[in-house]
Amino acid sequence: VGEPIPLDVSGHQTLADMYGVSYGDSKGITFRQLYGGVQEEYLHIPLFSKVSHKIDKMWMEFNRRGYIETPLGRKLSKENLKDMNANKLFNYMLQATETELNMVILSKVMGFLEDKHSKMVLYTYDSYLLDIHSDEFDDLQNLKILIEGNGFPTKIELGDSYSKMNSIDIETMDTI
């Protein structure tokens, strides 16, 4: 919706500071506004004002054209999206956008790793768990650039096990 994504702090923390609430409360408020419709009391916040406008515009366009188009060009027809309303459509498009963008990134990551000793162990909607071969640590910077090519900031964590991960500065490989 045109709001910048903070690079050094979580979006939820940025909004928590804006709301004057805790991080946990911020997540609840944010998800309620994004998935349940923006409540009047939050329309003064630029992000939510833009989200509300985007929901209305998307809903009008969906009803006018009879379909909605995903970022990669898939057309989802009204006939196939039963019992739809404006907020459900917005949620659906958030999920579709996230999935499509992640599939593009995942494809690039898999191509990047193709001729390497490093391997992907696990992928979730917001994380890649990689087993990086010790001779290929220098490739982390290129991998970070590849992933961030879609405009989303990336954090890198290293550890000997999933439960012992530490954030690192990719430039210096120092623990943050």
Set out the residue ranges of the language-model regions:
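Helical catalytic core of nucleic-acid polymerases
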Residues: V1-A86
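Hydrophobic alpha-helix feature that most strongly marks membrane-spanning transmembrane helices
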Residues: L34-Y35, S107-E114, L129, H133
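Non-catalytic terminal/accessory segments
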Residues: G11-H12, F112, K119-V121, N142-L143
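Short amphipathic alpha-helix segments
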Residues: L94-E114
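Catalytic palm active-site di-aspartate
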Residues: T30, K119-H133
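Short secondary-structure junctions
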Residues: G111-S118, E148-F152
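Polymerase palm active-site segment centered on the conserved acidic dipeptide of motif C
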Residues: S134-I176
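Short, contiguous acidic/charged loop-to-helix segments that flank catalytic cores in large enzymes
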Residues: K88-E98, D131-S134
